[in-house]
Amino acid sequence: NMKLTKINYNILVYLPDDIETMKGQNILADDFNMGAFSVTVLENMNAKDILKLEDKIRDIDGVAKVITGYDALGTEIPASILPTDIRSKLSKDNNDIMLITYNDATSADTTLNAVTKVREITKDACKVGGMSAMLLDTMDLAQREITIYIVIAVVLCILVLELSLNSYLVPILLMLNIGMAILYNLGTNLVFGEISYITKALVAVLQLGVTTDFSIFLYHSYESKKDKYKTKEEAMTEAISETFISVLGSSLTTIAGFLVLCTMKLTLGKDLGLVMAKGVLLGVITTLTVFPVLLLYFDNAIEKTKHKSLLPKFTHLNNFVIKNHKIIFTLFIKIGRASCRE
């Protein structure tokens, strides 16, 4: 399902139709039958080579028109006879400009394929600009880097959890649980048909950040109840009940917060809000179903890998806050007022 879910790299489709940019784009498409276009800079090419290149580009599927200054001048008339202000807009420092228009919209597959073929034909001889070219670069950059920062986020989370929890194995099990929830979320995005590349890039790290606490709470609850019940199954049953009651309020407020994004005129908010609200819900479900199974199955291994807490207990800080709570509250109010004034 993850592979079947289409990723939209065109940010323009999320803009409301009543803004000037979209009105202008609709007029160009409806009244002038003009789809996407690219402005291409040709480096150190003579007139004959440019005209030959035009013919090759015109043969590419999806290309509507190819225009350069040499369409009017030909190869016999030197560009130097043109007025300086006109010549400077068409050619400068041995660089010429070529305008390529396409039959379809900026993010259409035919347009993106055409831009790719233009780059293949011209290689290093030219630089292709425009929204379609930017979309291709964005797609390439997003696909290359998304895995890198997800791995970094997971490694950092495991390091922090190794310090804060009392078992070396639990952080790994916790990441497996959250990883399953993230995969479920990405797979079920198929119900939306497509999601934006921004949502795809953010969803894994955001879901990791907002749902990790649910699993930590379940683990602590389970550990506190193991000595109170005869079997670990009974302890887990009580831990699940306690966790459900505790995380219900926080998860619902988190879901509500993401759903508020759906009210934005920029519909990218709706795209991100729905996916993240679903992700939080799936995070709660896996915490109450998958994670308990992992804890019970690896219970003996968890006991063998237990260690002393590596973080300080912050006893002095706790005592300081309790003794000076009035002073801290007053400072908080004053800092808040000062921030509002600025």
Annotate each PLM feature.
Residues 1-9, 13, 106-341:
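Membrane-embedded transmembrane helical bundles of large multi-pass transporters/channels
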Residues 3-41, 77-89, 101-102, 337-341:
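Solvent-exposed, non-transmembrane loop/terminal regulatory segments of multi-pass membrane proteins
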Residues 15-18, 22-23, 47-101, 136-140:
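Extracytoplasmic
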Residues 32, 58-64, 126, 230, ...:
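Structural motif
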Residues 35-39, 95-97, 203:
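Short, solvent-exposed beta-strand edge segments and adjacent coil->beta transition regions
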Residues 39-43, 97-101, 127, 215-217:
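Soluble periplasmic/extracytoplasmic beta-strand elements of cell-envelope proteins
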Residues 42-44, 70-72, 130-132:
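A general secondary-structure junction signal
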